[in-house]
Curated annotation (Swiss-Prot):
<dbReference type="GO" id="GO:0000307">
    <property type="term" value="C:cyclin-dependent protein kinase holoenzyme complex"/>
</dbReference>
<dbReference type="InterPro" id="IPR039361">
    <property type="entry name" value="Cyclin"/>
</dbReference>
<protein>
    <recommendedName>
        <fullName>Cyclin-D4-2</fullName>
    </recommendedName>
</protein>
<dbReference type="InterPro" id="IPR006671">
    <property type="entry name" value="Cyclin_N"/>
</dbReference>
<keyword id="KW-0132">Cell division</keyword>
<dbReference type="GO" id="GO:0000082">
    <property type="term" value="P:G1/S transition of mitotic cell cycle"/>
</dbReference>
<dbReference type="Pfam" id="PF00134">
    <property type="entry name" value="Cyclin_N"/>
</dbReference>
<dbReference type="GO" id="GO:0005634">
    <property type="term" value="C:nucleus"/>
</dbReference>
<feature type="compositionally biased region" description="Low complexity">
    <location>
        <begin position="323"/>
        <end position="335"/>
    </location>
</feature>
<dbReference type="GO" id="GO:0051301">
    <property type="term" value="P:cell division"/>
</dbReference>
<dbReference type="InterPro" id="IPR036915">
    <property type="entry name" value="Cyclin-like_sf"/>
</dbReference>
<dbReference type="InterPro" id="IPR013763">
    <property type="entry name" value="Cyclin-like_dom"/>
</dbReference>
<feature type="region of interest" description="Disordered">
    <location>
        <begin position="313"/>
        <end position="335"/>
    </location>
</feature>
<dbReference type="Pfam" id="PF02984">
    <property type="entry name" value="Cyclin_C"/>
</dbReference>
<comment type="similarity">
    <text>Belongs to the cyclin family. Cyclin D subfamily.</text>
</comment>
<feature type="compositionally biased region" description="Gly residues">
    <location>
        <begin position="51"/>
        <end position="62"/>
    </location>
</feature>
<dbReference type="GO" id="GO:0016538">
    <property type="term" value="F:cyclin-dependent protein serine/threonine kinase regulator activity"/>
</dbReference>
């Protein structure tokens, strides 16, 4: 007999381990039980915040060796990463839809979410990889799911869930879910609500959370442009800065992580030593040289700034989808009710993974569309 929806939900939700029980998420610890170093196909994940002087983020302790901040990747590992990186990218048309303002993907929603992620990343001194992962999860989710208009709490809840998952993937010490909601947020979500949203994100992304990012390659490409030697710390800092600035904008969403990393490495090395096109063509064997040069030109032309995340203004009320006068008789009264209102449906497949049920054909629309929330009371975090 097939398991019930509620029992599947309980089983899947039990995997969402937050700091409250001091466990790792998704059983990613190695055979010795160490959580700090995770491996995927023999390739080491990046840990450490360069801008903080190599700290492990969030009280994780300093990482003294540059080798630990940007582990050296082998040729075989890089080739493996390139093969699977596309599975960790948003839909191919996502960037165009964002910039086109067609309405199905709201650029304002993304900007607000990234702005909040950046605030918490800075407050807790998280690693740069954590911040990038949170944005990666956000973009992949938004490229497939359409959040309803006028549900500001949904944007904030999605931001909290994405950053919470990213912190569990990369940080050695993870703040409790309530503590992630710093300052005076408009809405304060309970742990159970955050876990439910985490589950929605996880299932929608097919549980592919150890994403390939530009940080996975940056040491490799910097070494290539530095005669095989470890890159100076200044190069690493500058690379980290550029990668995060690129993540905040929308002009690079179509580029693969390897292409972004190669372009950033070429830009940083060029600023320091005057690397030219011939050096790039000779050094980079795993990426399309034309795409790398195109990405590098975009970096140099646009001079991306962190300010880009705050430049989008809300749409006029007349352009918003739907109506605010939804029937109150069928309106869930809380985020938990909305998340429970037909959103999560699980089924067994060949991979035994929990998946979100498709709502109609073609692109999946958010099941929240049929569950408007009328009460958006301002709640403050009291400490």
């Amino acid at each position: 007999m097939a398991p019930s929806s509620s029992s599947c939900h309980d089983a899947a939700a039990s995997m969402l381990l937050c700091a409250e029980d001091n466990s790792s998420i998704l059983w990613l610890e190695d055979e010795e039980g160490e959580v700090g170093e995770r491996r995927s196909g023999g390739c080491r994940s990046m840990v450490g915040d360069l801008a903080a002087g190599g700290g492990g983020g969030s009280g994780g302790g300093g990482v003294e060796e540059e080798e630990d901040m940007f582990p050296r990747q082998s040729e075989e590992c890089v080739a493996s990463l390139v093969e699977r990186e596309q599975a960790h990218m948003p839909r191919a048309d996502y960037g165009e839809r964002l910039r086109g303002g067609g309405g199905d993907v709201d650029l304002r929603v993304r900007s607000e979410a990234i702005g909040w992620i950046w605030e918490v990343y800075t407050y807790y001194n998280f690693s740069s990889v954590t911040a990038y992962l949170a944005v990666n999860y956000l973009d992949r989710f938004l490229s497939q799911y359409e959040l309803p208009e006028g549900r500001d709490w949904m944007t904030q809840l999605l931001s909290v869930a994405c950053l919470s998952i990213a912190a569990k993937m990369e940080e050695t010490v993870v703040p409790q879910c309530l503590d992630l909601q710093i300052g005076e947020p408009r809405f304060l979500f309970e742990v159970e609500t955050i876990h439910r949203m985490e589950l929605l994100v996880l299932t929608n992304l097919n549980w592919r959370m150890q994403a390939v990012t530009p940080f996975s390659y940056i040491d490799y490409f910097l070494r290539k442009l530095n005669s095989g030697n470890a890159a100076p710390r200044s190069w690493l800092l500058r690379s980290s800065e550029l990668i995060l600035r690129i993540a905040a904008g929308t002009g690079f969403l179509e580029f693969r992580p390897s292409e972004i990393a190669a372009a950033v490495a070429a830009t940083v090395a060029g600023e320091a030593t005057g690397v030219v096109e011939e050096d790039i063509a000779e050094a980079f064997t795993h990426v399309d040289k034309g795409r790398v040069l195109q990405c590098q030109e975009a970096i140099q032309d646009h001079h991306y700034s962190m300010a880009t995340i705050n430049t989008v203004q809300p749409k006029p009320a007349s352009t918003r989808r739907g109506s605010a006068s939804a029937s109150s008789s069928s309106v869930p009264e809380s985020p938990v009710a909305v998340l429970d209102a037909g959103c999560l449906s699980y089924k067994s497949d060949d991979t035994d993974a929990a998946t979100i049920a498709s709502h109609g054909g073609g692109r999946r629309k958010s099941c929240f569309d049929s569950s408007p929330v009328t009460s958006k009371k301002r709640r403050k975090l009291s400490r």
